[in-house]
Amino acid sequence: MGKTDGSSWFTAVKNVFRSPEKLIPRRINRRQDNDLVEEVEDELHQRPKRRKRRWLFKKVSSDPCAINVGINTTSTAINAIAAEETEKTVSPAAKETVFFCRTSVYLKRHVAAILIQTAFRGCLARTAVRALKGVVKLQALVRGHNVRRRTSITLQRVQALVRIQALALDHRKKLTTKLGDEISYSHAFSKQMWRTMEREAHSESELEDKRPSRLNGYGYQETGRRMSTDQAIVEPVKIVEIDKYNNTYSHHQQLNDQTPRGNSFVTRQAHSIPNYMSTTASTVARFRRPQSVPKQRSNRTCLDNNEPRLRLVRKRLSFHNDNPQSYGYIAGDGYFWYDIDKRTNAHEDFQY
């Protein structure tokens, strides 16, 4: 319908609306592509070049495609027949040379492929070894960290146990020291108490020793000690002596009624001597020499201090003191009476 040389009105309209800069390179590239395609088709199908393609304003029919397919099938069959004929016509020597040439090329290619494969495999092996080394190092680090953590935990536990044991030992030592201190304090306190008691007893004994002594019925000195032990020891002796002296007292009263007043001291003194002193030499000498008896001193202060007690005893025993100048005091075994005017001693026993 239209011209194919590019001078149609439609091409002119397209050229008007296109930019002049892009027009030239597009045309050049399109022409080059067309030339290349045509050359390839000519080589494959071995046919002369076709005319250049132009813009057409009609649909392409399917008949040319079918024609091209038929041409391709026929060309392949022709090529196969020609190859068979050439093989038949070729000599065996030429075939062997071609085979060896082909084998040498194949061998070179095979060796090159093997070398490439070995290099690639070696590279892969080296990378795998490096990865394994990294994994092993990582495992070693993790195991070392775990071992160090466990050892640190065990050491902390051991330290805690040691601290607890040390605290327990200190507590036990403190308890033992406290018990020892308490025992020592108790011993010291008991010793101090005993010392104070001994001092008090010693002071009391010194005071009693410093007190004025007095004569009992036997002519011996005795102090005014009043200890619980002495009282416990002396009390049964008092009872026995009281029983003895009751008899002597009655006999003494009989003798006193029969004998004159002047010899009363000697008779009373003779009867007042106990039995265990009757056979000694001192008692015999005392009977022979009555003037050797130590002179008794009147302790006015002691008697004055004991006057209330004497009055109570007199009231209890119904003793009547007719003579105001006579004094008496309680001895260890009875009541001792002293008369100032007559200078006589009277030893009277009584029982509480």
From Swiss-Prot:
- Segments forming domain IQ: 109-137, 138-160
Q: Which UniProt keywords apply?
A: Calmodulin-binding, Cell membrane, Membrane, Nucleus, Repeat
- Where is the region Disordered? 200-227
Q: Using the UniProt record, give the first listed, main subcellular location.
A: membrane
Q: Which SUPFAM superfamilies match?
A: P-loop containing nucleoside triphosphate hydrolases (SSF52540)
Region (Calmodulin-binding), start-end ranges: 140-164
- What is the protein named? Protein IQ-DOMAIN 15
- Organism (species): Arabidopsis thaliana (Mouse-ear cress)
